[in-house]
Amino acid sequence: MLGIFFYSYVAIGFGLLLPAIRVQNFLNIGARFTAGYAMLTIYVYVIHVLGRLPLGLTVLSAVMFGTVGFGLALYREKLRHFPAILIHPAILLSGMGVISVLFNGGIDYIPFTIDEFTNWLGISREIHLHGGYEAIRKTVHLPGYTPGWRLLLLLPWQIGGEIEEGLSAAAPFVLHIAVVALIFDIAVFLMRTQGQIKNALAVFLAWIFLLLFLGVEGMGKLWSYTLLVEQPQIYSMVAVLLFIYLSGKITDSENSSRRHAYIYLGLVLAGSYLLKIAAALFIPVIFLFAVVPQISYPFFAESIWRYRLQFCFLTLAPILVMVISWSILNPSTSGLSSPFMTLQLLVNGNFNYSNQEIFNFSDRYFSAIWEYLSGYKIFISIVAAVGAVLILIKRREGALIVWVGWFVLYVLALFWSHLTIFGDYYFQHLNSIQRFLRIPVQLFHTLGLLLLLEYSISILKNQNLIHAMQYLKNTATLVVGGFIILALGSWQIRQVHHSVADTTTRIYQNMDTRILEMKQANEFIKSIQGTKIPTIPNLVILSQPLGHASRAYAKYFARSVNAEGKVYSRFRVNIISSWPNDPQIDYRNLAKIAEFKSKLRSADVIWPIRVDTTLVSMLAELGVSTNCLSFIQENVIVANTNEGKRHFICQKKFAPKD
């Protein structure tokens, strides 16, 4: 609950510091919320990473600026828009999250994927434990990754000083609500301006559209069940397209409001880059969109270059500052950390693959893309495509043109990364195509459904159906619409509650059981270290023939700070696993056999996850009892030294003995 309050309060407060987009019939709530979240991301990067202000002071100053924003808004607006705010998605959906957390008895977060352990939450923990980003800047995993999401996740931890992953779980939820609130405001704006619908009915219909959009999961579940960066990346890039779309709806006569929309767009684009570098692909697309009249008409109705240059500067200057400052701060020679470094291959042509291999890869790559696009939420894709085509028949839509340009560059960049960054394994098997492609597809779904709404409003108006709806607003419209809102709203309440329960216990996800095993191993070791085992014991994980992921899980849970404030690992981690080789290959290798036995003899705690018969025989050689070995995966083996002789004692895993 504290996480929802923190992210929402600071983001909205920052947004209230911005000049309003003063266009008739447009609520600024979603726009301020979304841009404010981007401002928070930028602020933490500039103040903490570049300015090196301590994390605690960074968060405190952010809260103070947010408070100033609320104070200014209260002074300027008094309570004029209070009724509209109370029924706005920014408030009601946030309240839904708060109630779900309270009903659940609180919230925790169990990391779900290996990337969360090694990259996102794992790095956030390291930054927090070391007291700031600068302390780990040169040693962090994938140092070229922009730090925005890693920093956002740890911000609420500074309030109590403790790592509480449950607070971080609210970070994507609040950003999703902010962008959804912007969609709602645009929907109301379209109905009021293009449909000439009265305000109350416009809000009513906008809620129906919004709940339908959430019901089909246009940008995924309202409360994401992971803290991977993909969903926040989607939300922020959708916001980029939404602000381009909104800017195109503001007439040239409202130039000051259009400038303000460009400022919001620039902030969101810069914030998106700090989340993930793929947002940088918008830079050339937006630049070309601005300077080529044949592409941008009618976005710039007047071919005055001053307007085009104004658009370029306000939208691209913030992200260019982020790109340049990050490049200076964190120069990298690793293509995986900094993809731009791979461009030197274009000069020297030093590829690892022959032309024939690249040709064969191209066939597999583009076939995989088509297979995914033709199968992922195909019904929503068709509906969104219908909306896009119907609008394109009427005009060239700027946001859609920018999406197409970005998508082409994105697919080419992913192709290039397979050739230069990902390595031989992913050159043969393709690297998470589904994960990568879900981003542009969900961007298209959101934009296409919004365009379909716009077209539907124009059809209803032309057929005089809107007048009929307003006449019937006290009967059929309210009854049918009320039922839809009640049904879809109840569904969202259920979905959010499931997500809160799931992030806390993983009750609904097919979770890698090794995660909980390593969490329990950490608790087990904490209960006996320094007494029955050394202060810094050696944990050996048996994971045959599984992979090495459990080692990363164990290292994540092992990290802590000692009494002197020094960051350390509570235990050392070793693993016995032949992955990716067949275990039988290692068992025919005498050196490997000797290595495995040496690891077992040196262990203070042996934690079996998956054990084959060969490892069982090795444990028997150490003197582990037959009864223990019969149920080995239910037990943990602890080394004990008595009168100078080392022997191994069997205990139940989840009930350490006193």
Task: Spell out what each predicted region is.
Residues 109, 292-296, 306-388:
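Membrane-lumen/periplasm interface segments of specific transmembrane helices
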Residues 486-558, 653:
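Membrane-embedded, lumen/periplasm-facing catalytic core of multi-pass transferases
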Residues 99-203, 221:
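Active-site lumenal/periplasmic loops and adjacent helix-entry segments of GT-C-fold
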Residues 87-100, 267-268, 300-330, 403-406:
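Hydrophobic alpha-helical membrane-interfacial segments at the cytosolic entry of transmembrane helices
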